[in-house]
A protein has these predicted regions:
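Short pre-active-site segment immediately N-terminal to the catalytic Zn-binding motif
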Residues: 1-9, 21-29
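Active-site His/Glu-centered metal-binding helix of metallohydrolases
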Residues: 8, 12-17, 35, 39
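Short runs of predominantly hydrophobic/aromatic residues within well-ordered alpha helices
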Residues: 9, 112, 125-128
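A generic secondary-structure signal for well-formed alpha-helical elements
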Residues: 16-20, 25, 39-47, 51, ...
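Short, conserved alpha-helical segments within structured domains
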Residues: 31-36, 145, 149
Length: 173
């Protein structure tokens, strides 16, 4: 999948997450941008600027090799290792609250897909897509918030491992 195909897939994904299931883009952009970035990516490591630079520099095959290697590194590391130096990365903070050492948009386009990837690893594929399907069915033509998504997520998997993952990525009351 090249950069243009990923962008088209991402934007089509907004037909489900943002057009049908709505959220406050400024306060909780991770919901639509993170979910569509995750779902549109065939290699987990989404369509950020680095992928375009890599593809331009190394060609599509070199880019695929680079991102396959990066994906495998992500899969072999824990959350804390991959997001080194961060004691948390709250996805449910406004767009302009950026984790130290990160760029604007990192939470929404990078960290949110990583959160979803690890949630899927914890839950298993069937339960993960069941969770996303339930979010879609429950909140079509409605506005959804992080708390509601987390409630559905926990209804599919309320393990200590999942709650530790959630604690890293979400500020809860």
């Amino acid at each position: 999948m090249n950069g243009l195909q990923r962008n088209i897939a991402h934007e089509l994904g907004h037909s489900w997450f943002y057009d049908s299931v709505r959220n406050n883009e400024f306060r909780e952009g991770w919901i639509d941008e993170g979910i569509t970035s995750y779902l549109a990516s065939d290699e987990l490591l989404y369509q950020d600027l680095e992928s375009y630079k890599t593809e331009k520099q190394y060609g599509a095959d070199g880019s695929r090799e680079y991102y396959t290697k990066a994906r495998n590194e992500v899969r072999s590391k824990s959350e804390a290792d991959f997001l080194k130096g961060l004691d948390h990365c709250y996805l449910n903070e406004p767009w302009d609250v950026v984790p130290e050492g990160s760029n604007a948009g990192s939470k929404e386009y990078s960290y949110a897909p990583i959160f979803l990837h690890h949630a899927k690893e914890i839950m298993g594929e069937e339960a993960f897509y069941g969770f996303l399907s339930e979010v879609y069915r429950t909140y079509t033509n409605k506005v959804v918030h992080s708390e509601e998504i987390l409630k559905i997520l926990r209804s599919h998997n309320d393990s200590k491992e999942m709650n530790d993952l959630i604690a890293f990525y979400f500020k809860e009351n």
